[in-house]
Amino acid sequence: GKWISTGISKGGQTTMFYRATYPDDVDVSVSYVAPLNRAIEDGRHEKFLAKQVGTKAERKVVKQAMQEFMKRKKDLMPLFHEYCTKHDYHFYLPEEDIYDYCVLEYPFALWQWGTPVSTIPSLDDDDNTWFSNLMNVAEPDYFRYPNKYMPFDVQAIKELGYYGYSLKPIKKWTSLKSTKGYLKKIMLPDSLRHYDFDATLYKRTVKFLKKEDP
C-alpha cells in the first residue's frame, strides 16, 4: 500500500522535516500549514499581516480594532484583571503588558483561525462587547505560566523559530518599547532562556525542498 505523511502547523513542519530527513519513508507528504521559520522571530509574518492577508479594507478594520482595544485599555483593564484572576492566570510580565501582547496577537489569531472580520465590534459597541471579542480571539491563556506549550516554545527558540510582533499599529498607546525577544521573556522561565537559535534544520529543509519540490 501507499503511505502518506501529513499534518497542520507543527505537524506540517514535522511533515517537511520528515520528508527532508527520510525522503524514501513515505510516498506522499501533505502539509496543510507548515511555517518554515528562519529565526526565533522570522520577520515575514508582520509584513504579511500588514500588507497581504485579506483585503485592504479588512486589514484596515483589524488595525482599527487593535487601536480601539488600546484606546479602551484603561476601562478594559479591570475586566482583564478580573478575568485573569478568575482563571488563576499567572504571567512573567505585568498584566498591563500582557494585555498589550493580547492585542498584538489579535490579528495573527484572527486570521489564523479564519475568524470573520465582520465579528469585530463597531466603535459604538460597549466595553463588555469589545472585551469579549478580545478574549474570544486572543485569550491570555496563551501567555500564562505554567504553559502547556512550553516544550514547543523551547523547540521554537532552539530550531523551529516563530513569528514576531510589530508595534506600529499600537505604538501611540502602548508602553512597550520593543517586542524583540518576547518568546523567551513571556513563555519561558529563566532557566530555559539561554538557548540560541540554530538555523541548521531550516537551511537543510529549504535546500531539500528547493531541489526536490521547486
Q: What are the residue ranges of the model-derived segments?
A:
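Alpha/beta-hydrolase fold nucleophile elbow
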Residues: 1-9
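Hydrophobic/aromatic beta-strand patches that form the interior of the parallel beta-sheet core
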Residues: 4, 28-32, 214
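Surface-exposed, flexible loop/turn segments at secondary-structure boundaries
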Residues: 11, 37, 165
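Catalytic nucleophile serine of serine hydrolases
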Residues: 9-10, 33
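Solvent-exposed, well-ordered amphipathic alpha-helical segments
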Residues: 5, 16, 202-205
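C-terminal subdomain of alpha/beta-hydrolase-fold enzymes, centered on the catalytic histidine
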Residues: 104-214
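Alpha/beta-hydrolase
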Residues: 17-154
